[in-house]
Design a protein with these regions (language model features):
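Bacterial Sec-dependent N-terminal signal peptides
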Residues: 1-22
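An aromatic/glycine/proline-enriched structural segment found at the starts
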Residues: 222-278, 374
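Histidine-acidic residue clusters that define the catalytic metal-binding segment
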Residues: 22-31, 119-123, 129, 137, ...
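Mature N-terminal segment immediately following signal peptide/propeptide cleavage
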Residues: 23-57
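A structural supersecondary motif
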Residues: 103-107, 283, 310-350
């Protein structure tokens, strides 16, 4: 049975039921708009520090949108954005950004997740207008005009294979083994973010470009600019720079798969010869808050409750860990999302050698206390 791990949130259920689901007011200092092609933008002035700005492209797509032949290519595509675009061939973009004092990794970066990909130009010194124009042009090219030249793809294979080699330590390998237990028989269980060695060595070029053309469309993207800028001027620049990106003839639907319920607890023992410690991970699956309730006062109240739960449990487990007879080395508790279709409360216990049963029991006693007596 898919358990509803209500926790302290149940204490607030009566209030939630009678509250009007009023939308939270937007920050009046944030200018929000949408171009005809579907691209959304957010702009806010912030002059601390002066003459600095942040530029982001958020894309509502990640590894979960890959097909089997595209495993790892959402992340691979992120790398290709730094290897040649329409207006910045080869390494021109990186070279230019470094020429104005930006550093790769610190000011220039990107991140690929299971359900989203973000490109960031952070803390950029905007000492002249042309720098703003070029940063927006870089996001424009990431959005729809990455070159993905065969020779650049082949050159990047080795880079990502080395990243994979260093990333896949014992914890990562056990995480990959755990995916089917988290996500059941859904496509989510097959996605590893970085892909297999064989896949990275041998995928055909079109697999990467097919993913890019299908998913990197303006209706799936947002541009964010925050910094010491004139908001109206930035809005005009965004409209001028991004309006040439074509809207898809048929918008691509982002399919989301429900995580199957289970009648009995799912138990797995996962090992790795290079593991340096032992721990117990526990998940309680929950239905997510309905999308229409996001950005409402109810959602905000629940987020505060979750934060307080996690804070209280963190302090409680810290106190227990500090005791000399504690069966575990550390423990944690959190409430978040497993994917867009499933939220989860999660616990993690690192236990002393030979004390798995005692550590699990001590952890669950605290969970039951939390549920039954509301932290008193």
């Amino acid at each position: 049975m898919k358990r509803k791990f209500i926790l302290f949130l149940a204490f607030m259920a009566a209030s939630v039921a009678v509250m009007a689901q009023n939308p939270l007011p937007n920050d009046p200092e944030v200018k929000v708009g949408k171009l005809e092609n579907g691209l959304t933008y957010y702009i806010r002035h912030n002059d601390k520090p002066a003459q600095r700005a942040e530029f982001y492209l958020a894309t509502n797509v990640g590894a979960f949108q890959e097909t089997d032949e595209q495993d790892g290519l959402a992340h691979f595509l992120e790398h290709m954005c730094f290897n040649g675009t329409k207006n910045f061939p080869g390494k021109d973009l990186l070279n230019w950004l470094q020429s104005i004092g930006a550093e790769f990794g610190r000011n220039i970066n990107a991140s690929t997740g299971f359900e989203e990909t973000q490109y960031m130009l952070n803390n950029i010194p905007i000492v002249r207008e042309g720098i703003v124009d070029s940063c927006l042009l870089a996001l424009h090219d990431y959005s729809h005009f990455v070159s993905c030249l065969p020779e650049e793809i082949d050159a990047e294979r080795g880079v990502i294979l080395e990243e994979r080699r260093t990333r896949r330590d014992a914890n990562w390998r056990m995480f990959e083994k755990a995916l089917p237990y988290y996500y059941g028989d859904t496509p989510y269980a097959k996605r590893t973010l970085i892909g297999s060695e064989e896949q990275l060595k041998n995928f055909e070029y079109h697999c990467l470009t097919d993913f890019y053309r299908k998913w990197y469309n303006p209706d799936m993207q947002a541009v964010v600019v925050v910094g010491d800028v004139d908001v109206n001027q930035i809005e005009e620049k965004i409209r001028k720079t991004f309006s040439d990106i074509p809207a898809p003839a048929v918008p691509t639907e982002k399919v989301m798969y429900p995580i199957p319920a289970n009648e009995e607890p799912i138990v797995a023992v996962l090992t790795d010869p290079e593991a340096t410690g032992s721990n117990i991970s526990i998940l309680w699956k929950m239905d997510p808050l309905p999308e229409q309730m996001n950005n409402t006062d109810v959602a905000y109240m629940l987020s505060l409750a979750k934060y307080q739960i996690q804070l209280i449990m963190s302090e409680r487990f810290s106190d227990i860990t500090s005791q000399p007879d504690s069966p575990f080395l550390g423990a944690g508790f959190g409430i978040g999302n497993l994917c867009e279709t499933c939220d989860a409360a999660s616990g993690n216990v690192s236990f002393k050698p030979g004390m798995a049963k005692e550590a699990f029991s001590a952890f669950m006693i605290q969970i039951e206390k939390m549920k039954k007596i509301w932290f008193h």
